[in-house]
Amino acid sequence: MMQVLLVTISLAVFPYQGSSIILESGNVNDYEVVYPQKVTALPKGAVQQPEQKYEDTMQYEFEVNGEPVVLHLEKNKILFSEDYSETHYYPDGREITTNPPVEDHCYYHGRIQNDAHSSASISACNGLKGHFKLRGEMYFIEPLKLSNSEAHAVYKYENIEKEDEIPKMCGVTQTNWESDKPIKKASQLVSTSAQFNKIFIELVIIVDHSMAKKCNSTATNTKIYEIVNSANEIFNPLNIHVTLIGVEFWCDRDLINVTSSADETLNSFGEWRASDLMTRKSHDNALLFTDMRFDLNTLGITFLAGMCQAYRSVEIVQEQGNRNFKTAVIMAHELSHNLGMYHDGKNCICNDSSCVMSPVLSDQPSKLFSNCSIHDYQRYLTRYKPKCIFNPPLRKDIVSPPVCGNEIWEEGEECDCGSPANCQNPCCDAATCKLKPGAECGNGLCCYQCKIKTAGTVCRRARDECDVPEHCTGQSAECPRDQLQQNGKPCQNNRGYCYNGDCPIMRNQCISLFGSRANVAKDSCFQENLKGSYYGYCRKENGRKIPCAPQDVKCGRLFCLNNSPRNKNPCNMHYSCMDQHKGMVDPGTKCEDGKVCNNKRQCVDVNTAYQSTTGFSQI
């Protein structure tokens, strides 16, 4: 078993508390000053690893309000993928992609000793920076910028002065699921990772021109890493793991039209991801960080339940200056919408004054999910079964040295079933993370009773007609990567064509937007898209609604019908001004026999739409 270095750091409290100070998070009106004093103590038998700058586990001892606290930290080993890349562009538009070393990084998660409900997200790159939750209260720690000093400030979130009184909103406007049964009380839905299947979101972040003007700034990278690390810590109770596989910087110009209209920008970003980014880098989800100030005080926006869909698996998040935790909460909020979670209503509760899915960002943002969010998430996984996030990264995709006992099967390990006390795998020796004598395997869909299954055995069944089954190779315990049916294959009794593993048809889009009673409106309703009016158009250019060509009317605005006896207008389906981003026909949707909608809102021949030499759709 690999030995790790245990570090103890004592934080001696300075003999005074400050009344007001300007820190990275803003003007803080009450804080404590502490001095981290690093004490290295190698456990018996441990070996120092000189090539590793940042230890895998660390422990900090300090005082908060005069009481001793022990903070245990463990490196976030799934923060980066092995093929993590960064992309910049030359002024002439040429792309340059590099793979910077990220294995020995300095981002940690943790807990407070003897506090079962505690948590922490810390950067140890230059001093200690981040936050921890102690006895239900959020504290922040960051280095004080004093010469020749190890001084740090510790303060509560409530002591950061508010920037303004204007409510900050999320741009997603849908409300609640049509519930089949009552939502459980919060006491019945205490969120722990053991309740949920582990999922991995392989994320690409795009930094737009407004935020990436200083493209060579190390501070921008640090900001992104801290935000993603904090968002991961928020998702831990739901067993959701966000792995950063790439960052792209739009240094000289934006590659889409980023405007003050959040919904227009979201549409443009989704189209760009489907037609450009997906052809260059395999990933599950893309997120745009921007400094653009959107209309209606919108902080973020996404497509509800869009995860794993080419056009809809995207979010936009407005960065909040140096308040990285606030940005992380917004990021987690929008990703949660993409995972099927709605805004909290008046009956939604968590053990905090507000919850992650509140439609308005609180002065003191919460890290807790409500009973409603847990219900929404469980229901989403059951109904939608998003394929891409159930593919864990391959062992070689997890960076940093392996740690035996963390239940992550990493490069160099034959198995990892957790600690000896908790291991329930009969094939694995928990103390060494090696297979027991006679065992051929200990993990994987192609492993049964410690033996590798024979070649040709189905290890992952096709989920639907736009998926294909995977088979064991007979050489490995791992099931091959999930493959999808060829784009353009007819599906759902010829009502649609497969597109990146989905069968997008208008009926399902109407149901997703308006509930199970909704249906597609009559063909005559789509003639409204010829007008270029408020409710009928094909696309927008510089804020102007462009009418559809006659052959493209079914690729513009989506018209749905509510099959209710009280509904007298067959073309009447209300979209508010904030709903426009979700009222368009999805790319890949069948518009005529043998034709589908492309990203330009054109109804084109299905064979032309899916011609590709790279294996990616050119729709």
Swiss-Prot record:
Tissue-level expression reads:
Expressed by the venom gland.
One Pfam family, please name it.
Answer: ADAM_CR
SMART domains noted in UniProt: ACR, DISIN
**Cellular component per GO?**
extracellular region; plasma membrane
Q: Which positions are annotated as binding Zn(2+)?
A: H333, H337, H343
| Places the protein is found | Secreted
CDD domains recorded for this chain?
ZnMc_adamalysin_II_like
Broad class of enzyme this protein falls into: hydrolase
**Post-translational modification summary for this protein:** N-glycosylated; probably required for conformation. Removal of easily accessible sugars does not change its functional capacity, but removal of the core sugars with N-glycanase causes a virtually complete loss of enzyme activity, apparently as a result of major conformational changes in the molecule. Not O-glycosylated.
Signal sequence span is 1-20
Propeptide residue range(s): 21-188
Q: Which UniProt keywords apply?
A: Blood coagulation cascade activating toxin, Calcium, Disulfide bond, Glycoprotein, Hemostasis impairing toxin, Hydrolase, Metal-binding, Metalloprotease, Protease, Secreted, Signal, Toxin, Zinc
Chief localisation class: secreted
| Residues involved in Ca(2+) 1 binding | V403, N406, I408, E410, E413, D416
- Annotated residues that bind Ca(2+) 2 are located at D467, V468, E470, D482, Q483
Q: Which positions form S-S bridges?
A: C215-C251, C308-C388, C348-C372, C350-C355, C404-C433, C415-C428, C417-C423, C427-C450, C441-C447, C446-C472, C459-C479, C466-C498, C491-C503, C510-C560, C525-C571, C538-C548, C555-C597, C591-C603
Question: Which cofactors does it use?
Answer: Zn(2+)
**Which EC numbers characterise this protein's activity in its record?**
3.4.24.58
The record places the motif (D/ECD-tripeptide) at 465-467
List GO molecular-function terms, semicolon-separated: metal ion binding; metalloendopeptidase activity; toxin activity
Q: How does it assemble?
A: Heterotrimer; disulfide-linked. The heterotrimer consists of 1 heavy chain and 2 light chains (lectins): LC1 and LC2.
Q: Which family does it belong to?
A: Belongs to the venom metalloproteinase (M12B) family. P-III subfamily. P-IIId sub-subfamily.
Function noted in UniProt = Catalytic subunit of blood coagulation factor X-activating enzyme. Activates coagulation factor X (F10) by cleaving the Arg-Ile bond and is also able to activate coagulation factor IX (F9) and protein S (PROS1) by specific cleavage of Arg-Ile and Arg-Val bonds.
Put simply, this protein is called Coagulation factor X-activating enzyme heavy chain
Recite the lineage of the species. Answer: Eukaryota, Metazoa, Chordata, Craniata, Vertebrata
